[in-house]
Amino acid sequence: PMVVPLKHAFQTACRSNISWDCNLPDECLNLVKSWLKNLSEVGTIEFPRYCFSCERNSIKSVSLVGFADASEIAFGGVVYVRIESPNAIHANLLVSKSRVAPTKPQTIPRLELLGCLLLANLVAPVQSALSSVIDLSPNAQH
């Protein structure tokens, strides 16, 4: 979500067919200024390098959870790993991706399908990488 406004501003600038040495249109400039203001308010975002925060032998189940969404401006997907242990349930962000909606107008259902396709393309390599570390099958006993 952080880069979508910049991608949208770039797309808007490209659509306006301005020359490379001209100033940005006000709409694009306002989007960039708004993004910079919001960026300073975000603070620090930290992600753990190791997603299995509990002992491997105490893990009851591991599952991948994916979400996709779309709007008129963009669509995207995110994949989390959900780890259940006897004491707690942890969820960690693994990967996310966003895309600006195509310049040709699309319906929201079509953009939702593009988001689902993006998510499917995110899940496959994550599942492949994690399957060499831990069993992700639904009935796996850890």
Label each region the model flagged.
Residues 1-57, 63:
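C-terminal reverse transcriptase regions that engage the nucleic-acid substrate
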Residues 2, 12-13, 72-75, 84-87, ...:
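Flexible loop/turn segments at secondary-structure boundaries
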Residues 19-30, 54-58, 67-70, 103-112, ...:
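Conserved, non-catalytic sequence blocks in retroelement Pol enzymes and Pol-derived host proteins
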Residues 118-142:
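RNase H catalytic domain
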